[in-house]
Regions:
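Bacterial N-terminal signal peptides that target proteins for export
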Residues: 1-9
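Thiol/selenol-based redox catalytic cores and closely related redox-interacting motifs
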Residues: 92-145, 152, 156
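Short cysteine-rich clusters marking metal-coordination/redox-active sites
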Residues: 41
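Bacterial signal peptide processing site
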Residues: 21-23
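Mid-length scaffold segments of soluble, non-membrane domains
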Residues: 65-105, 109-110
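Cys/His-coordinated zinc-binding microdomains
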Residues: 45
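Short, intrinsically disordered, charge-biased short linear motifs at domain edges
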Residues: 6, 25-33
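C-terminal motif of bacterial Sec signal peptides marking the signal peptidase cleavage site
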Residues: 16-19
Length: 183
């Protein structure tokens, strides 16, 4: 390939990348969507309204409908999972400091997950009965929750991958017996 062809190919790639970057910058952040009978959990494939506790909704590029999660922990796992490599536009979670009812936080409690404070490692579990990353709009509300329920207050980026991607209800120190396994 001659030098002119190489430079032309590089210029074409640069223009394409630039156009994609500009397109991504122009994507408008959607508003949170109210839960409805058609809100189905991404992983559990169950109606979200059947589960108690905080929820998450994730909005993706070129998808007019949010992806629902019956637990905030599952939404964070989706964001961090290497298999789920979608371009995210917005992530909303329930502000449990504003929720009048733990079981059903309400559609007026959605906040941007990037701005939330999370309590991890508390005695409270999520809608699927597993450990939860409990979101709050204010650090003071999260700290008050910790006083009553235990745990630690962190930001979204500080939640350990192992907390959301690791196994639940399994003693990780337990050795698995390979007796009888095909080797």
């Amino acid at each position: 390939m001659n030098i002119f062809a190489r430079l032309s190919a590089i210029a074409a790639m640069a223009i394409t990348i630039s156009a994609c970057s500009e397109q991504g910058a122009n994507i408008e952040m959607p508003l949170p969507v109210a839960l409805g009978e058609d809100s189905v959990g991404h992983y559990c494939n169950m109606t979200i309204l059947e589960h108690t506790g905080p929820k998450a909704q994730i909005h993706l590029v070129n998808n007019p409908h949010p992806i629902w999660f019956s637990q905030v922990r599952d939404g964070i796992a989706f964001l961090r999972s290497p298999e789920e490599n979608y371009e995210t536009v917005a992530v909303y979670v329930n502000d449990m400091g504003k929720a009048e009812d733990w079981d059903f936080p309400g559609d007026d409690t959605w906040i941007d997950a990037q701005k939330a404070w999370f309590v991890i490692g508390s005695a409270k579990t999520g809608g699927m009965g597993t450990p939860e990353a409990i979101p709050f709009g204010e650090e003071q509300s999260a700290s008050a929750f910790v006083t009553e329920n235990g745990g630690v207050v962190v930001r979204l980026a500080e939640i350990p991958d192992a907390y959301v991607l690791g196994p639940v209800g399994v003693d990780q120190k337990q050795e698995v017996s390979m007796t009888g396994a095909n080797q």
